[in-house]
Structure formats: structure tokens, C-alpha cells
Amino acid sequence: MKKLITLILFVFSMVAVQAQDSLPDPNIPLDKESKTIKFSGVVHEKGTKNELFNRCVYWLNGYYKSPTRVTQIRDVATGKILGKHSFPLYTFDTVSNTNIKTAKVNYTFTVMFKDGRYKWQIDELEVISNKKVPLEEMINKNDPRYKKEWKSYLTQIADFIKSWSDNLEEKMKPEDAKKEKDDDW
């Protein structure tokens, strides 16, 4: 169901691809020190470091098809989970009136835990179509290699990460908070 919602978000974002130039610039965070793109958030949530770690593992198992292949580090002692994955990017084909998978994005995610809070981060993003393109190159519209579909790609990437982080934050809530929300009808 979660993946279906993410796919629907992608499809709706692709409807706007026809008018790529009219798309607003997506919010892509560039780290000024490292000059790399890093999406991140710190969330205050009830629970110990271990409880938050276990909730995240539960989320991983529901979110990813093969979570053990996705994660490279699952260290309870340090409170860190690190994984690598990818997702598709689409371009709208006006002839067939459909979205066509034209590229994929590789990314690395890290979730770190402390008592009462956790931090998530997505970085090392690279778009792969005919060749690997670091995301940092795609935000420079003055670059002679800039392609007009990159704006659509950046929008899809920002939408994916928003959906990913929203899903993580929802699953990281303690069970009693979820039940209270359900009971308030």
C-alpha cells in the first residue's frame, strides 16, 4: 500500500512533466560545506534509543521488499542504520500519453538514534540514465550539459524523499500514539 501511494505520487508528478519549464524549482538542500546534496531531519519521538531502533527495523521490513539486502549497517550499540537503494524516474511521452521509466536514482540513507529522538539523512544521490550524473550537477542550470528533463527529475526526487521521510516518521510513532489517533473518530 505504501509503495502504491509512492507510485501514485510519482505518476501525479509526471503529469506535470509535459510542462517541464513551468514546474517550480524543487527544494533541493545543498550542504554549503561539502557542496553535496543532503536531505535530513531530526525528529523528537518518545522512546529509548533501542526502542526507536527497533521501530525503524520494523519500518524497514515493511517499506523495502528485501530489507536485509538494502541495509549495510544495523548496529544497535551505536544506534545506526545505513542502507543503499534506488528508485525509478519517469518522463512523460506525449505520443503514447504515458510515463516511461527513463532513469533511476541511487541513494544512501542513514538513521541514527538517541533517547527521545532520531535523525534521518539521505545523500550520495546519483541519477543513472545513459551515464551516472551526481545530483549536484543537475541543479546548475547554467551548465552547458544541463537537460530540461532534469528539473522534472529533481521534482520527482524531492517528492520521493518527502514521501519516504513522512512514511518513516509515521511508523516511528509509538503504538499508543497511533491507537489514540485511531480512537479519535
Please tell me what each predicted stretch does.
Residues 19-185:
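Ser/Thr-rich, low-complexity intrinsically disordered terminal regions
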Residues 1-23:
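Bacterial Sec-dependent N-terminal signal peptides
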